[in-house]
């Protein structure tokens, strides 16, 4: 299984668009994860159209248009492995222990603020 992992893209505030190499990885992946802070709903639309499977959540910089379409936490089981995607806006100190307490039922945890 090929996985592409994205987070904190902040399009168009930090860049106008994703680089071609990222789009190549997205299109080659079986599953694409995005851990929030999209900023633009246009990126969600394009990523959704170009991904085989998109698993995503909203981040703290995402407005109402993205929050209405994305969950705060996304869970999926692939090949028997449980994945969770969350942006997680708590303090960096103690994040791993906090996430282990809050989400004990996952095998792979994808967190934003990358």
Predicted regions and their residues:
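Conserved catalytic scaffold of divalent metal-dependent phosphoesterases
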Residues: 3-34, 38-114
């Amino acid at each position: 299984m090929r996985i592409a992992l994205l987070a904190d893209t902040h399009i168009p505030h930090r860049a106008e668009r994703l680089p071609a190499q990222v789009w190549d990885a997205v299109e080659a992946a079986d599953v694409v994860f995005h851990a929030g802070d999209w900023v633009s709903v246009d990126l969600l639309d394009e990523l959704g159209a170009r991904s085989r499977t998109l698993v995503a959540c909203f981040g703290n910089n995402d407005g109402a248009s993205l929050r209405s379409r994305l969950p705060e936490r996304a869970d999926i089981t692939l090949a028997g492995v449980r994945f969770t995607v969350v942006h997680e806006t708590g303090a960096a100190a103690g994040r791993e222990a906090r996430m282990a307490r809050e989400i004990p039922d996952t095998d792979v945890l994808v967190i934003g603020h990358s």
